């Protein structure tokens, strides 16, 4: 069954809304972004959440020492590397790693296997932007990889297209951020519930 990660969580209220709707994990962004979360705030949120939901930290080209400090301070369960990190970098991380790739054409599975992460995340490509664009991409590039590896699908997912994405790829996880937000920003609990309900319906 495909799981749901709600990314760009910025408050305890948003985290609880995701947990109560049935999300598998929340994503907390520690990289330059409108959804960036300060370390002390993330640590406070995660103390309240305890082990009730997985907490995944999103990083872009972060120094390994600083990443390890944030993982410990915020009690992160996993990290998502969303930048240009090389395969050797993964060996410096003490928790499971999700490695992100921005898709702009065909993908070579053997090249991707150099990283050996816990899972591969695929997002849409936009020059100079590391995720969170709200844009989707051609999922057909991922069909072979999805049959062989754990994949997480991101990039422009919403209540209108997530059912089709799951039917086409059967990813381990779907990752959503802007697709469950209010027009003014911030997570919309009703959209989170609707999104997760659609994902769960695909398993029946």
UniProtKB/Swiss-Prot annotation:
Substrates-to-products reaction catalysed: N-(5-phospho-beta-D-ribosyl)anthranilate = 1-(2-carboxyphenylamino)-1-deoxy-D-ribulose 5-phosphate
Record has Isomerase as a keyword: yes
BP GO annotations: L-tryptophan biosynthetic process
Keywords: Amino-acid biosynthesis, Aromatic amino acid biosynthesis, Isomerase, Tryptophan biosynthesis
EC number(s) per entry: 5.3.1.24
Pathway noted in the entry: Amino-acid biosynthesis; L-tryptophan biosynthesis; L-tryptophan from chorismate: step 3/5
GO MF terms held by the record: phosphoribosylanthranilate isomerase activity
InterPro entries the UniProt entry points to: Aldolase_TIM, PRAI_dom, RibuloseP-bd_barrel, TrpF_fam
UniProt keyword Isomerase present: yes
Family that this chain belongs to: Belongs to the TrpF family.
Name by which UniProt lists this protein: N-(5'-phosphoribosyl)anthranilate isomerase
Native organism taxonomy: Bacteria, Bacillati, Bacillota, Clostridia, Eubacteriales
